[in-house]
Curated annotation (Swiss-Prot):
The keyword Transferase does not apply. Catalyzes the conversion of 4-hydroxy-tetrahydrodipicolinate (HTPA) to tetrahydrodipicolinate. Pfam families: DapB_C, DapB_N. The active site is at residues 144, 148. PANTHER family: 4-HYDROXY-TETRAHYDRODIPICOLINATE REDUCTASE 1, CHLOROPLASTIC-RELATED, DIHYDRODIPICOLINATE REDUCTASE. Belongs to the DapB family. One of its GO terms (biological process) is lysine biosynthetic process via diaminopimelate. The gene is dapB. This is 4-hydroxy-tetrahydrodipicolinate reductase. (S)-2,3,4,5-tetrahydrodipicolinate binds at residues 145, 154-155. GO terms for cellular component: cytosol. NAD(+) binds at residues 8-13, 88-90, 112-115. InterPro entries: DapB_C (IPR022663), DapB_N (IPR000846), DapB_N_CS (IPR022664), DHDPR_bac (IPR023940), NAD(P)-bd_dom_sf (IPR036291).
Length: 255
C-alpha cells in the first residue's frame, strides 16, 4: 500500500484527493500538511501536522496542489528530506521553476500544470498540428470557474509553449494575451492566449488553428475536478518507481 502525503489539503483538488485515497484500497493517507485547523475529520492513523519534516518522513510520496509560495516552501525543505513529489500547483514563477529543477537532482519530481490524461494528449496533438500546419494562426482559449486566481491558466501556457516550440519560436516573443483598440493586423507568428472566467467550469481548453477557408479546433473539457485527483494518484504510483529527475505527465504516459 502506497503511503501518500497531501500538501494543499484545504483546496478543491486537495479535498478530492483525500476522499479518493480514503476510498481506495491501494493507497494510505499517511500525512496531511496543514497551516490551520481542518474543517473535517480524518482517520486517526493519518498524521496531521504543521511540521514539514514530520510530514515528509511519514509518506512514500507527496502530492502538492497548493500555491506557488507554499510549493516553494515545500521544495526548500524537501531538499533536506527528499521524497518523490507530484506537483500540480500552477502559476510558478521562474525562480520556483529553477528551484524545481534543482530539487529534481535529489528526488524524482513529476510536475504538470494539468493532471488530466486527455490534456496530455491535447498537448501532444496540438504540437503536431502546429508543426504541420505552419501557415495557420494559433489561438488558445481557456475557461475556468470564477474562483480561479491565475490567468492564463497554467495549462493554457503549457499548450502555448508546446505550439511555440513546435515552430521553433520563443513563447515570450510571440504570446498575446488579450487584444484591445486599433492594434493593426495580426502578426503571423502570434500565439493568442485568452482567458474567460465564470460559473463552476472545471476547465475547458481549446487550441484553434485558423487558415484561409478552413480552421481546426481541438478542445478538452474537464467535467469534474475529480479527473485531476485521479490523474495525480496515477502519477504518484508512477513517480515512486523513477530515478531522480524532473518528469512530465507525457513521460509517464510514454507519449
Amino acid at each position: 500500500m502506497l503511503k501518500v502525503g497531501i500538501f494543499g489539503a484545504t483546496g478543491r483538488v486537495g479535498k478530492l484527493l483525500i476522499e479518493e485515497i480514503l476510498n481506495h484500497t491501494h493507497f494510505n493517507l499517511s500525512s496531511v500538511y496543514v497551516r490551520n485547523e481542518l474543517q473535517y475529520s480524518l482517520p486517526s492513523s493519518t498524521m496531521v501536522t504543521k511540521d514539514f519534516e514530520i510530514f515528509l518522513q511519514a509518506s512514500d510520496v507527496i502530492i502538492d496542489f497548493s500555491s506557488p509560495e507554499a510549493t516553494k516552501a515545500l521544495l526548500e525543505v524537501a531538499l533536506s528530506y527528499p521524497k518523490p513529489l507530484v506537483i500540480g500547483t500552477t502559476g510558478l514563477d521562474n525562480d520556483i521553476q529553477h528551484l524545481l529543477e534543482n530539487a529534481s537532482h535529489t528526488m524524482p519530481i513529476l510536475y504538470a500544470t494539468n493532471m488530466s490524461k486527455g490534456v496530455a494528449m491535447l498537448n501532444k496533438i496540438g504540437a503536431l498540428v502546429a508543426a504541420t500546419l505552419k501557415e495557420s494562426d494559433i489561438e488558445i482559449c481557456e475557461i475556468h470557474h470564477r474562483y480561479k486566481k491565475d490567468a492564463p491558466s497554467g495549462t493554457a501556457l503549457t499548450l502555448a509553449q508546446s505550439c511555440a516550440k513546435a515552430r521553433n519560436l520563443k513563447l515570450s516573443d510571440v504570446r498575446i494575451s488579450g487584444r484591445n483598440g486599433n492594434i493593426g493586423e495580426r502578426n503571423s507568428n502570434e500565439i493568442g492566449v485568452m482567458s474567460l472566467r465564470g460559473g463552476d467550469v472545471a476547465g475547458r481548453h481549446t487550441i484553434g488553428f485558423y487558415l484561409d477557408g478552413e480552421y481546426l479546433e481541438l478542445t478538452h473539457n474537464a467535467t469534474s475536478r475529480l479527473t485531476f485527483a485521479k490523474g495525480a494518484l496515477d502519477m504518484a504510483k508512477w513517480i515512486v518507481t523513477q530515478k531522480n529527475g524532473l518528469y512530465s505527465i507525457e513521460d509517464a504516459l510514454e507519449i
